[in-house]
Amino acid sequence: MKFIVGIVIAVAMVCGVYTTNSITESIDKTSNNTVTTQTDNNYNKRILGGWESSASGGSYYVFNNDNTYYWYESSSNLNDNYYKGNMEILHGTDAMDELGITLEQVTTVMSNSNYKVGINNIYCIKLNPTYLISGGVDKTNTLTDKFNMKLLFVYVDENNAQAYNYTTNDTYYLVKK
């Protein structure tokens, strides 16, 4: 866990982050005429699209608005060696809970980044592959739960992010493509 907090601190110190606090609320009536309030945040929209690893020949993630994703071994070949599947995006305190990140750890990160990184920059992206192409061959029938991944995704700005893959223990510096 200290390693993960170190990653978040490094992002905060090196890149800086712009956050917003715009949350809109909408009132929705349920079938029994009880009024409920739903928080509609647009934070997830900022991570949608393609994110390429800054490493030479690095992997490429595409997060879609319909809760699907693609993971490509390389952005230079989008026809082979890729997964596609379903994803769930958790944001803020929900992401922290899922990943086991404490408020104390985030507070330390916020302080070390001069309050440029905060809870609104933290995401948990749960990836569940449903389709696999490897070496030009459909290998979907080989997928098991061990292929599910969980990412800590720290949004830096509209062009930069950092991710830590809890499943593989890999760290990625990502650039919006």
Question: What do the PLM-derived regions correspond to, one by one?
Answer:
Residues 34-50, 62-64:
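N-terminal helix-cap/turn-to-beta initiation motif at the start of protein domains
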Residues 15-34, 38:
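Sec-dependent signal peptide cleavage junction
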Residues 1-21:
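Sec-dependent N-terminal signal peptides of Gram-positive bacterial secreted proteins and lipoproteins
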Residues 7-9, 32, 92, 158-160:
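Short, intrinsically disordered, low-complexity terminal segments
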Residues 30, 175-177:
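Short, solvent-exposed mixed-charge patches
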